[in-house]
Amino acid sequence: MSFPQLGYPQYLSAAGPGAYGGERPGVLAAAAAAAAAASSGRPGTAELGAGAGAAAVTSVLGMYAAAGPYAGAPNYSAFLPYAADLSLFSQMGSQYELKDNPGVHPATFAAHTTPAYYPYGQFQYGDPGRPKNATRESTSTLKAWLNEHRKNPYPTKGEKIMLAIITKMTLTQVSTWFANARRRLKKENKVTWGARSKDQEDGALFGSDTEGDPEKAEDDEEIDLESIDIDQIDERDGDQSNEDEEDKAEAPRARVAPPASARDQSSPLSAAETLKSQDSPLGLVKEVSEPGSTRLLSPGAAAVGLQGAPHSKPKIWSLAETATSPDGAPKASPPPPSSHASAHGPPSGSPLQHPAFLPSHGLYTCHIGKFSNWTNGAFLAQGSLLNMRSFLGVSAPHAAPHGPHLTAPPPPQPPVQVATGVLHGEKASARSSPALPERDLVTRPDSPPQQLKSPFQPVRDNSLAPQEGTPRILAALPSA
């Protein structure tokens, strides 16, 4: 087999069909005919050999079809000069001479010299949208800024933008670099600067100039959060957050405690008595049973007794006020119910209202057996403090001095009688609420408006009207 077009007539297939293993008999026959024609020199056989050679070249080198026109030309199947062959078939030289052939690509190819190495399109490495790696030249600017601001290495937003433009880095890269630089400074300063307090280690290590300006401090904190590198988060952040939660949990307890102490200091009692009531919740109940005691009621309970149920509210601020409140004392010593009616007054274990604590108009509250009616709202709409007749019997022995108290100040003698009656009534327990109508049946006369003379008679008539029906209904029950 020979390629006379390429100037290699000496490259013959001497081995015959063994060179290709009998796979291409047509190609080998055409090559043998071309070689015979070239050796004989006859024109007929030369043309036949040229056609056979063109067929052989086309079949073997089909991708280089440009060799076809030259195969049919006369005398081209003979020996060709080597230089002329290179000038004619220079476009094929790239397969054999990769280094020495400058004319591999014709001028019609407008391809980039290395188009496969730029995945970002037409921009090479100057694409403004592509992040730039931090080099030593770019970080030198950041190091210079850090050395100038070593006391407060927290750049503002504008300074970060300026440094990002100068160093051709992104804002996130600048923030991350400063975060890492601050961590390196902390590690160095722990060794060289000595021990620091925990607050300074957590955030104020460098003595920031923004200690007196809270707005700028918040700005620095926000920027510091933006520049945190997620891969290198300090473990002290979790400890600091736990301490903040503990401080927030202690703050509500500190705010709840002062109101009770402020009210205790403003009370008429002394501070020693207040502390005594806080130490022993049952102390006031024990003092009531003593004959010569004058501290019969705490200021909180006296205020509730004078103002009435509409102005009372639950005491949740202090243990002392909860223990000395009217609804707290009966729970400490609940009075047992009795079968007979007692006209002497409240039991000994209930907090009483001493006459010394009463104002000039001298209104007395009911004993503790009927206090549940006040709290349940049975007499709220009837002016219960002015209508004492429904709570105190008219013909009761201790109710006689109470008539003048509605219009004139009380004389000193009736309060002493009330106190002695209370002290003598220690043995008698409090009456239960079902026994209330029974005493009213015994002591109430048939015509109460004619019995009691007072300028408040119309008010009492209106208030007593619904109450007078209750004994009559209950009186009819035993007869039925």
Curated annotation (Swiss-Prot):
It is found in: Nucleus. Residues 190-285, 318-354, 401-480 are annotated as: Disordered. Residues 127-189 bind DNA. One of its GO terms (biological process) is specification of loop of Henle identity. Residues 210-232 have a biased composition (Acidic residues). InterPro entries: HD (IPR001356), Homeobox_CS (IPR017970), Homeodomain-like_sf (IPR009057), Iroquois_homeo (IPR003893), KN_HD (IPR008422). Residues 264-280 have a biased composition (Polar residues). GO terms for molecular function: DNA-binding transcription repressor activity, RNA polymerase II-specific; sequence-specific double-stranded DNA binding. GO terms for cellular component: nucleoplasm. The modification Phosphoserine is found at residue 241. This is Iroquois-class homeodomain protein IRX-1. It comes from Mus musculus (Mouse). The lineage of its organism: Eukaryota, Metazoa, Chordata, Craniata, Vertebrata. The gene is Irx1.
